[in-house]
């Protein structure tokens, strides 16, 4: 099934959001580096790389279906520069929640259009986002350890 113009736009929006997530994670890694939290910064850099992999999965899906993937405008990260470790993880969680909601919206749109071809990819992403949010939530439990 060929992608409709509406679904193509929604997939392109998701591609852009995944790339934006990569930039957000990279900015958060810079904040962690500024706090001399090298392990945390490394984890955030790996997350940034993973978001690019996610964007590529969506790009491949669009391309495999004979459509043209198009990256949209990517906003500069709005996360502050003077964040605590807890605030960094809270910002990561907030962005993961934003990505999760966008994936659920894309899932609902493809379902409404009867696009079963997108289901395997989107099922994978729904599972992935559960894991991503759970990890970020676990790190926000640092609050109990902050002085």
Q: What are the functions of these language-model segments?
A:
Residues 140-147:
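Conserved small/polar residues in nucleotide/adenosyl-binding loops
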Residues 10-17, 21, 25-28, 60-61, ...:
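Acidic/histidine-rich alpha-helical segments that form the ligand environment
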Residues 33-73, 136-139:
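Conserved alpha-helical segments that form or flank metal/cofactor-binding pockets of metalloenzymes
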Residues 1-12:
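Extreme N-terminal tail/first-helix region
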Residues 7, 40, 44, 121-122:
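DHp/HisKA histidine-phosphotransfer helix
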